[in-house]
């Protein structure tokens, strides 16, 4: 009875393995068609969720979803009246501490006070300078500049809304040269190299664009025997958008 049960378990295991292998092979085949074309997708080179670094009310949020922006352009502004007031107070305290130190140093030269008093004045000045630096840092975070040229993918907040540190504000994507990502059979590495040319048929536009392989993935999937390949479309193609998909056609595979 035990031997029969063992055989049943073995058969079930073999069937499960074959089923899993068949599913993997089917998934790999879905990525290509009978003509050897490979499924590919356009991805932004950079996609970032901008978050708040301070607690403040949003004073300026000029961009809406789909709007374009330049690198370095301020795309979020905060009401920082409180932080600016704290900075002015810290700078005034620094000036006062510096004046006390200079006075104590002159008095020490006349032997009116000792070295300890001068050292205390120096410590108070350093503390005031640190407070001013901290306040200056907060004021510097009262606006968010775009790290690259791109477009707004999603707005998480609205103007005049109060946010705290860590709150997501905007999802932005770079709209320069988009990156093509695809999964190809690992045996293609026998001839596929960075710089190899191919064309990509974009389904959403019904157009074909020249492209080239930029880099090959660092490892092969041992189960599916596939590897990731990344490419770029030649030239500036403003009609292309992140998320578009299509087919990569390699001349040697026609």
Task: Give, region by region, the residue ranges found by the protein language model.
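Bacterial N-terminal signal peptides
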Residues: 6-19
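Short, surface-exposed secondary-structure boundary micro-motifs
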Residues: 74, 80-81, 118, 168, ...
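Alpha-helical coiled-coil segments
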Residues: 82-137, 155, 180, 224, ...
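Structural microfeature recognizing short secondary-structure transition sites
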Residues: 153-155, 208-254
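N-terminal beta-strand block that forms a small beta-sandwich/beta-barrel module immediately after a flexible targeting
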Residues: 21-55, 214-215
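Surface-exposed patches in structured soluble domains
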Residues: 41, 59-62, 68-74, 145-188, ...
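Low-complexity, intrinsically disordered
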Residues: 175, 194-210, 238
């Amino acid at each position: 009875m035990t031997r029969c049960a063992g055989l049943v378990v073995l058969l079930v295991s073999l069937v499960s393995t074959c089923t899993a292998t068949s599913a993997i092979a089917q998934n790999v085949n879905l990525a290509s068609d009978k003509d050897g074309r490979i499924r590919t997708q356009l991805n932004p080179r950079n996609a970032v969720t901008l978050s708040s670094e301070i607690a403040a009310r949003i004073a300026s949020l000029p961009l809406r979803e789909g709007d374009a922006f330049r690198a370095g352009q301020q795309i979020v502004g905060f009401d920082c009246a409180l932080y600016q007031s704290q900075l002015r107070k810290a700078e005034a305290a620094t000036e006062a501490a510096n004046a006390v130190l200079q006075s104590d140093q002159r008095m020490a030269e006349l032997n009116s006070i000792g070295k300890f008093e001068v050292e205390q004045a120096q410590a108070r000045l350093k503390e005031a300078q640190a407070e001013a630096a901290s306040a200056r840092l907060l004021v510097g975070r009262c606006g968010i500049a775009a790290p690259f040229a791109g477009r707004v993918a999603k707005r998480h907040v609205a103007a005049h809304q109060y946010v705290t540190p860590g709150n997501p504000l905007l999802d932005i994507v770079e709209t320069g040269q988009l990156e093509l990502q695809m999964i190809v059979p690992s045996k293609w590495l026998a001839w596929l190299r960075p710089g190899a040319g191919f064309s990509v048929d974009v389904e959403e536009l019904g157009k074909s664009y020249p492209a080239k392989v930029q880099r090959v993935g660092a490892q092969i999937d041992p189960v599916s025997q596939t590897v990731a390949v990344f490419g770029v479309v030649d030239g500036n193609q403003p009609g292309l958008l992140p998320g578009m998909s299509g087919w990569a056609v390699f001349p040697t595979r026609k």
